């Protein structure tokens, strides 16, 4: 296994940008082709396709291509951990000012227009928040879930034990589960922002220069010089087999 890992690292080191998209598109196509060629239910089972770094901005880039497959049997998977300082690092304790809400709305709308409106289902397979302010965490999760519900996107709350006690089988924050139930009820309402959020949160929001997934610089917007066509990386079968074992 170690030799195989070294092979992957050496073969694709430094391959971001256009080449990074070509590699991922090629892997995703090879995955679909491999499953479909194995008979039985594999011919039509639904397959989940990982976006670029699970990042919404990078995945909505036109260089990312969904694999060719039978109609309506591939589902896109991305994550939502924006901003990283609130969702992953526990540096920002409060969330919910106007600019932060607008950025969340922008990202979900981006998924809607790029994929949902073109017949491609989307799942946010991970989301969550680490900020210490309980009301902000609940508001973040409720607003994201409600936006996704209204735009036909399914969501999975990622829990590492901080939300649900697997010994007592109880929620640490009961209001969170109540908020998620409200958000998925199908009722028309606007999640209520906690008081004083505008004063307690920073005004900065992610921009097109900020990666949603890890706060590293995002890929530049495609230009005529590097916009790809429908072609993807050609990965020989023997290479794919060596990577997958």
Task: List each model region and its residues.
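Aromatic-rich peripheral "rim/lid" segments of glycoside hydrolase catalytic domains that contact
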Residues: 134-212, 217-219
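Extended hydrophobic/Leu-rich segments
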Residues: 10, 176, 180, 189, ...
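Long, low-complexity, intrinsically disordered segments
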Residues: 216-245
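Extracellular glycoside hydrolase catalytic/binding regions
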Residues: 10-153
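Intrinsically disordered, low-complexity segments enriched in Ser/Pro/Gly/Ala and basic residues
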Residues: 76, 207-210, 241
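Short, small-residue-biased leader/transition segments that mark boundaries at the very start
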Residues: 3-8
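Short, solvent-exposed loop/turn segments at the edges of secondary structure
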Residues: 1-2, 71
């Amino acid at each position: 296994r170690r030799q195989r890992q070294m092979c992957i690292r050496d073969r694709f080191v430094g391959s971001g940008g256009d080449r990074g998209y070509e590699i991922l598109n090629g892997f995703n196509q090879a995955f679909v082709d491999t499953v479909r060629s194995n008979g039985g239910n594999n011919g039509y089972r639904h397959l989940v396709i990982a976006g670029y770094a699970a990042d919404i901005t990078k995945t909505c880039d036109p260089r990312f291509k969904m694999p060719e497959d039978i109609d309506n049997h591939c589902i896109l998977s991305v994550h939502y951990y924006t901003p990283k300082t609130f969702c992953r690092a526990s540096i920002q304790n409060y969330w919910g000012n106007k600019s932060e809400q607008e950025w969340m709305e922008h990202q979900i709308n981006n998924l809607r227009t790029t994929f949902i409106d073109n017949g491609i289902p989307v799942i946010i397979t991970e989301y969550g928040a680490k900020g210490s302010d309980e009301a902000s965490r609940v508001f973040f999760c409720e607003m994201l879930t409600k936006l996704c519900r209204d735009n036909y996107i399914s969501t999975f709350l990622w829990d590492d034990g901080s939300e649900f006690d697997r010994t007592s089988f109880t929620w640490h924050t009961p209001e969170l589960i109540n908020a998620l139930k409200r958000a998925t009820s199908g009722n028309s309402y606007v999640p209520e922002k906690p008081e004083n959020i505008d004063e307690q949160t920073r005004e900065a929001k992610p921009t097109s220069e900020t990666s949603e997934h890890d706060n590293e610089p995002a890929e530049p917007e495609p230009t005529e010089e590097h916009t790809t066509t429908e072609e993807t990386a050609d990965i020989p079968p023997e290479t794919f087999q060596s990577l997958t074992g």
